[in-house]
């Protein structure tokens, strides 16, 4: 997890990258721009906790461009956002799909944004079952648990009826920024200033 500015390195490009990330953190901005997995989510959770500890009165801005990924890893970020004493504003640039869309919706109400050309996609969780036949029922119940949990999370944050969420997440459900605002995933759209 990169939080502090690296002072010495043999690679000038790496030093510049670390300094840019540190500059963002100094401005209370976290960049989530990859697949949701344990490594990135551990880093994001660490950055959220670090920024809350630095100043518990200022908002944190979480910029999201993610195709989604691990549900359990994403839920660690979700739970952290929900339990911080500071407001987390979420901003979609590019794509917020699957778990990325759940994290986008998890921002504080009236502080969830998307850029005008962003795409948001929700669906039911994917499952890759690798278990003996005798354990398949356990895996199926676990998958159903996460499907129900994510649908309830989306229903809570969007104010959509649970039945509507269940219907919409049966397949990939893509939304433009405008549609995501109408749906309740975001509250505001950044319009291009041309």
UniProtKB/Swiss-Prot annotation:
GO molecular function: ATP-dependent peptidase activity; ATPase binding; serine-type endopeptidase activity
NAD is among the record's keywords: no
Signal peptide positions on this chain: none
InterPro entries per record: ClpP, ClpP/crotonase-like_dom_sf, ClpP/TepA, ClpP_His_AS, ClpP_Ser_AS
Pfam (any one): CLP_protease
Alphabetical list of SUPFAM superfamilies matching this protein: ClpP/crotonase
Cellular component aspect of the GO annotation: cyanelle; endopeptidase Clp complex
GO process terms (BP): protein quality control for misfolded or incompletely synthesized proteins
Key words of the record: Cyanelle, Hydrolase, Plastid, Protease, Serine protease
Broadest EC class assigned to this enzyme: hydrolase
Principal cellular location given in the protein's record: plastid
EC number: 3.4.21.92
Catalytic activity: Hydrolysis of proteins to small peptides in the presence of ATP and magnesium. alpha-casein is the usual test substrate. In the absence of ATP, only oligopeptides shorter than five residues are hydrolyzed (such as succinyl-Leu-Tyr-|-NHMec, and Leu-Tyr-Leu-|-Tyr-Trp, in which cleavage of the -Tyr-|-Leu- and -Tyr-|-Trp bonds also occurs)
Cellular localisation: Plastid, Cyanelle
Domain of life: Eukaryota
Active site per the UniProt annotation: 98 (nucleophile), 123
PANTHER family attached to this UniProt entry: ATP-DEPENDENT CLP PROTEASE PROTEOLYTIC SUBUNIT, ATP-DEPENDENT CLP PROTEASE PROTEOLYTIC SUBUNIT, MITOCHONDRIAL
Protein task: Cleaves peptides in various proteins in a process that requires ATP hydrolysis. Has a chymotrypsin-like activity. Plays a major role in the degradation of misfolded proteins.
Assembly, per entry: Component of the chloroplastic Clp protease core complex.
UniProt record similarity statement: Belongs to the peptidase S14 family.
Protein name listed in UniProt: ATP-dependent Clp protease proteolytic subunit
Gene this chain is encoded by: clpP-A
